[in-house]
């Protein structure tokens, strides 16, 4: 019948005119609907008992021809109004996950530095030299003095450029013309931008000398504090100890002489200054230790911040009488603070700190055995080395796995994602969905041959309408009879349904 079909078709397909026409239309359009399949079966007068087999053969042919079988969204029509049809029918379509709208933030453009409100000739010489700035303030008195101050500032700018002492982040763009305003105002250290976007703050303040890299700015700031030698560390530690003693005296003593109280307050304040000095002089030690833990789930600045907390603890606990350098003592506190923070914050799924230590120990032993044996050690070998059971080793290895994002790009171009390769276990196969729709229609046609009460009892007992089976007591309350009477009706109805005249239509759907 179909000249385009080279393979031998099953007789139930080849003898059906409407089904063959449906296949040809599917080849042309690339897809067919489930309702069209049902209408084709009815047009060719295919017995309902053969629908399952014919659908199976049809689905195989469509897969070979590359035709998609679409599931109809419409629910089957019901010819009888059932008593149990109070709750909505069970939906068979898959759940559609609503995509959350992603709002893109406008990237606020950095404020362009506005020209300071001074004469253009004196702008370039204002930043480098403090003495030139002082001369500029005196230059307001007379025009001749102003000219002299400009020349002196220009000479100092040239000298500092030759010595290489200019700031790295000096603006290279030509300053824009601006209206004159008196120097030395409150906004002298800020650059205000008037070209703000609607969603940006009304004013944008840019710190002088700041860059777009916060790590670089931080390293630049802590690099200004000179390092300490051993004698200076001991001296600062003594001042810190005296300050802590003075704070304790002030807190626990109710009645102190005014003179003694003032002296204790001075000593306590001096101890706080010494503590800050010791902290600031050792911030570079934290950076050097934090570099060893980069790439393990935390940002570099976060590692530095956690290490600074450990440094504060080390300053408070340092005992200069032991004779050790402060850096030797502080290293352990900094390292502990960083590792504890990584164990608590680095993972997407938090793992307790004690379990993280077990995971790290297992990883170290596994690397060592890999070098010794030249192969991956078995769980039994690891268990013997770690003094634990093989089951426990496998469990700890599972805890150490890192989750992978479904949006991880694959390939060199990154045109596909990892989630594209994961099978959706809840997805409904189109052929099964069409088969289920046909089963529902046949089931309702069989229930139509029963009385209204019998059909209602069976529907509620097996949850044919809402997917929630009901007990005999619940059905009895609906019909106002006892649970025993409902059991009798159910038994009688099931006997009727087992008769070949009714069961033969549904039996083909069991496999």
Curated annotation (Swiss-Prot):
Span list, region Sigma-70 factor domain-3: 357-433
Keywords tagged on the record: DNA-binding, Sigma factor, Transcription, Transcription regulation
Sample GO molecular function, one term: DNA binding
Top-level taxonomic group: Bacteria
Entries under Pfam families matching the protein: Sigma70_r1_2, Sigma70_r2, Sigma70_r3, Sigma70_r4
Motif (Interaction with polymerase core subunit RpoC): 302-305
Location of the DNA-binding region in this protein: 472-491
GO biological process: DNA-templated transcription initiation
Amino acid composition bias (Low complexity), ranges on this chain: 94-121
Region (Sigma-70 factor domain-2): 278-348
Span list, region Sigma-70 factor domain-4: 446-499
Record carries keyword Transcription regulation: yes
GO cellular-component term (any): cytoplasm
Main function: Sigma factors are initiation factors that promote the attachment of RNA polymerase to specific initiation sites and are then released. This sigma factor is the primary sigma factor during exponential growth. Its activity is stimulated by RbpA.
Similarity-based family: Belongs to the sigma-70 factor family.
Protein name: RNA polymerase principal sigma factor HrdB
Source species of the chain: Streptomyces coelicolor (strain ATCC BAA-471 / A3(2) / M145)
